[in-house]
Amino acid sequence: MNNSLWSDALYRLSRNRAAMFGGFILILLIICAALAPWIAPYSYSYQNLSLGASPPSADYLLGTDVLGRDLLSRILYGARISLLVGFVATGVALIIGVSWGIIAGYIGGRVDSIMMRIVDILYGLPFIIFIILLMVIFGRNLWLLFGAIGAVEWLTMARIVRGQVIGLKNQEFVMAAKAMGVSNISMFRRHLLPNILGPIAVYATLTIPQVMLLEGFLSFLGLGIQPPMSSWGTLIKDGVESMEEFSWLLIYPGITFTITLFALNFFGDGLRDALDPKT
């Protein structure tokens, strides 16, 4: 995309109030996560066993968990892990999926058939086994976990991008560019990528909360974040287990996650409209 298209997209995005509100919430969450060590009332590992499972109070605004750890502090610290795994894993998925989909869709023929059969095979493999193998081979590592989650989330993006590229490559403007001798790299950059950024943006905003919950599931299996560290996924999992007795342990992490989900959806929809060259 040239500078004019980027400027137009930024202008359209700035005129979308819902997208701006979603973006503001996301920026606020990122700032809170980054400043968690300074703004959190307590450390994420601090325990006051005499006040275990206490409801919200003046000292513990959102209450404590069964081990007497401040829930507000754990939500703030958990935001660092959840947002990081969300953005990093989604970034890995986008890089692999977009590249795979563009190559398969643009080249077509036997190459497309082979590449998409590989995608179909990978869809049938249990991702848990893949992640366990990575952990066994390379050892438990937080960044490896992020990369592993991204490596199993790219398949849908590859299919989406491939379908978009197949629909675009026979359009008149693409055929004209080919006739003028435009290189494949320029074709991708100037004609294909600008027209698929909208669907990519929407899928990315849907993938981020999905990988957040996936991280919580992996932590439950002992493959993800380990105590005393926390993420929103692990907090929600713990809250579900004790929701009948201590409902606040699920309500507040759930509200935080829901607000993040809506903010991502608002911002993603705005990005889709702003990046659509037809608007």
What positions do the PLM features span?
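Glycine-rich helix-loop "coupling/hinge" segments at transmembrane-helix boundaries
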Residues: 135-137, 149, 164-165, 206, ...
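Short alpha-helical transmembrane interface motifs in multi-pass membrane proteins
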Residues: 81-85, 100, 112-116, 143-147, ...
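Transmembrane alpha-helix boundary and packing residues in multipass membrane permease domains
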Residues: 29, 102, 131-136, 145, ...
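Generic hydrophobic transmembrane alpha-helix motif, especially the helices
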Residues: 61, 65, 71, 95, ...
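Short hydrophobic alpha-helical segments within the ABC transporter permease transmembrane module
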Residues: 71-76, 83, 118, 161, ...
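Residue-level hotspots within pore-lining transmembrane alpha-helices
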Residues: 80, 122, 126, 135, ...
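Short helix-capping/hinge motifs at transmembrane helix termini and TM-loop junctions
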Residues: 36-44, 105-109, 134-140, 152, ...
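Gly/Trp-centered helix-boundary motif
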Residues: 1-98, 102-103, 109-110, 124, ...
